[in-house]
Amino acid sequence: MMRPVVVKEKQLNESQIHAVEDEVRQAKTMDRDIVTHAMKQSVAKLNPKVMIKNPIMFVVEIGFIITFILSFLPSSSSSIPGWFNITVSLILLFTVLFANFAEALAEGRGKAQADSLKQSKKDVFANVVKENGDIVQVSATDLRKGDVVIVKQGEMIPSDGEVIKGLASVDESAITGESAPVIKEAGGDFCSVTGGTMVVSDEITIVITSNPGESFIDKMISLVEGAARQKTPNEIALNTVLTSLTLIFLIVVVTLPIFTNYLGFQIDTAVLVALLVCLIPTTIGGLLSAIGIAGMDRVTKFNVLAMSGKAVEAAGDINTIILDKTGTITFGNRMAHTLLPVGNETIEQVGKWAAISSVLDETPEGRSVIEYVQGKSISYNRELAEQGEFVPFKAETRMSGVDLQDGTKVRKGAVGSVIEWVQSQGGTIPKDVNQKADFISKEGGTPLVVAVNNRIYGLIYLKDTVKPGMRERFEQLRQMGIKTVMCTGDNPLTAATIAKEAGVDEFVAECKPEDKIAVIKAEQDKGKLVAMTGDGTNDAPALAQADVGLAMNSGTTAAKEAANMIDLDSNPTKIIEVVGIGKQLLMTRGALTTFSIANDIAKYFAIIPAMFTLAIPQMEALNIMKLTSPLSAILSALIFNAVIIPLLIPLAMKGIAYKPMSSNALLSRNLLIYGLGGVIVPFIGIKVIDIIVGLFI
């Protein structure tokens, strides 16, 4: 009996292993394809119309053209051999190619993601319901906003829409990567559906909310391909500074021959070009675009869709995060924790009526009450409740329960609402009701009062558990100087307890959607950048007001349109990771800029003595690296300048190691590693290259 089971299990494991091996092979093939495409693109990007978008590398390309032409002309200097110009031109060519490769590689990863998304955009037909009730099959490309479509089991949802009738399980793995289907139903905050996803059970009727080319997948494809990518304000500012430096050094180099002629010697044009390339910040100039593209790519890999690079950068500068309590800080499933009788009632009586009020209640809270009562072996008449008329919870009444056939009315609900209901029927309120309700609230729980007609029997203690690790995560944010504010509809006592347990800095109790906007504006008035999460239509104004608004993919269309980021996994806690990615992007750009500028110090000590030693022997004192010869020094500096770009591509793509710490500590750390390192590494690198070059010249 056991042997077939063992064989079957072994075969299953082998198939799983083969599946994993296939995935690995496909990933390697994709990586090879991306690299091959990037190599081709690095050559295509040599087009001056493309290169001029990056002024720094455009100057290097002009230098390549000049030295390449000079290599075919007679040398004006007897000290410069004929092969020198062509060697310099080749090094400059590879410098530009390496920079182009970095950008093309970053773009290639986005295009690979776009290709996989395009697979979900197949030729789909939709069953459109006409005004007269007839159902007509049309192509998805012919659908327009406002069309009503029926989607059955096994059919693909043709375009973005909202469910107006029915309930169904929808497979969203084409977008989210999550294989587990999600429930979509009419009404509420989970009615939004996305084109390209598939209905795996039941049937729904949807109203189309986007025209062709405007769907969610269309936007994703456009964004990850980079077609909609615009340079961020910080990127533009840095690019302006780097371009200004390049212009200053260009003026210096162009005017240098005037002074050298005055001193009685001439500098070869190729040497001047080499000096210019070594002076300008080519390292960061070659990696700047790749850093920005890779930053958005990292967000996308986290299953978060950023509508612009500006949103990712803003996440890195966030000062305050507004967080909902339910589902973000806590699990959101309030479960029955204990029963508290009041007056002279017993726990058995409370349990009996609590269970009867919950038999027809399909909410998680109602189910948890039944489970708790059964776990305590408290008896109750289930049939009695099933024969009664269920009274659902309403926002106006804040109660639910059941009206039994004999006229008995059983209710459970918010303390104030049930007390008011009992008093309206002439009942009296036990003295310890409010006392025990306050106790539950102070413990961080939610009190529900159980009453029958005009008599209160006791309270149900519902407890919502704080997610593990939240206190540590908020402490990390605090170390980064980020304030956390919890917004909750709970009463102040419950809110204060949860806030203390979770470790948030501030909380807003009994919070309404409009209160969130007030909190955001108050923080922004202090000059702070604010991030928040949301999924409902009522969250849309606050998401639009926030500097970083992260909407849940499971939420409404209004919320997703108002936000500048969308979490495909619908996990509100991911806002913390998004902030980390934003900070990593800014840190990577800053660190590599520091490294690039620090590099110039070593290049000065390599190339300047080489240029002036023959005319000014005293300049030999600056040759602290003891380089072999002037020509070797110039070539070594140029080679290092070129090689450092591809060596830093992995760092630009992956981002520098990120640890939560204060801004001052972060600045000191980066200056030590990338500032001091940017000075030391070129000294070592240029010297090693000089030794190798010295063997050939």
UniProtKB/Swiss-Prot annotation:
Top-level taxonomic group: Bacteria
Binding-site list for ATP: 361, 365, 393-400, 412
Keywords: ATP-binding, Cell membrane, Ion transport, Magnesium, Membrane, Metal-binding, Nucleotide-binding, Phosphoprotein, Potassium, Potassium transport, Translocase, Transmembrane, Transmembrane helix, Transport
Keyword Nuclease on entry: no
Any one GO CC term of the record: potassium ion-transporting ATPase complex
Transmembrane segments: 55-75, 79-99, 245-265, 271-291, 605-625, 633-653, 677-697
Subcellular location: Cell membrane
Topology versus the membrane: Multi-pass membrane protein
Binding site for Mg(2+): 535, 539
Molecular function GO terms recorded: ATP binding; ATP hydrolysis activity; magnesium ion binding; P-type potassium transmembrane transporter activity
Active-site residues per Swiss-Prot or TrEMBL entry: 324
Reaction(s) the record says it catalyses: K(+)(out) + ATP + H2O = K(+)(in) + ADP + phosphate + H(+)
HAMAP family the record matches: KdpB
The protein's name in its UniProt record: Potassium-transporting ATPase ATP-binding subunit
Biological classification of the source: Bacteria, Bacillati, Bacillota, Bacilli, Bacillales
